[in-house]
Amino acid sequence: VITASTAHIEQDECGAAERFIGSKVLTVETNNGKITTDMVKKHLHGFDFEHHSQPKVVSITQVTEMGTVYSPSEISEIAGFVHGYDMFLHMDGARIANAAAALDMPFRDFTTEAGVDILSFGGTKNGMMYGEAICFLRPGLSADFKYIRKQSMQLASKMRYISAQFIAYFRNDLWLKNATHSNNMAQALLKKISAIQGVLINQEVESNGIFFSIPKEVAEELRKSYFFYPWNEEISEYRLMTSWDTKDSDIEGFTKLLSEMMSSS
């Protein structure tokens, strides 16, 4: 499996991908979370050579871990490339609703139509209580999945309660309202923190994530009042995520405190 060095399956799953499917995860370095065909190409060697792991899947994340969004053309280019090597394209869509809202287009336009073979369709990060849907977009790929699901202990005894959430999620475009709100809140937050002297914005804000650098001592004090993750401690970089239930008052309170701390640091 070839993926970005920032991908969730590489960084945040405790080695689950390698343990449970028995496949090597190979990574490519990327500054903005996106991978390109040139990045993938360096791992495409050793085919039919028993001493080398055999490349079979490229996994991309939409929205990426860096908050950036792939365009349909970028995805199509990757899909066409990997299919030429008889490989599959997987999309981690934990924040796929935010991507659809940002691109202002249906899911199909940047998944099925763009050549994605397997999609993990997320809802937990956009208001659902829990659960993901696995979508097989190429005929035949799901043939043995029900056995894999059972063996990997992913068949819940009341699976219908997980599935039922998607009915409400899609009804009246609730998913889109939630994702649009989340993205809009990120832009509002970006506007305010960008105006604070000493705050450095490190990535384009294309969805609901903001990556910024502030002095470590300021961040440590700020985290006593607001929860957010450190991202790259070497450059004192931190990640802010807005969500479906972020309020204007949350942004006002956070930026007011940050401004006060930066002024006195």
Regions found by a protein language model. Give the residues of each.
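Conserved PLP-enzyme active-site core in the AAT-like
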Residues: 1-203, 207-213, 217-221, 225, ...
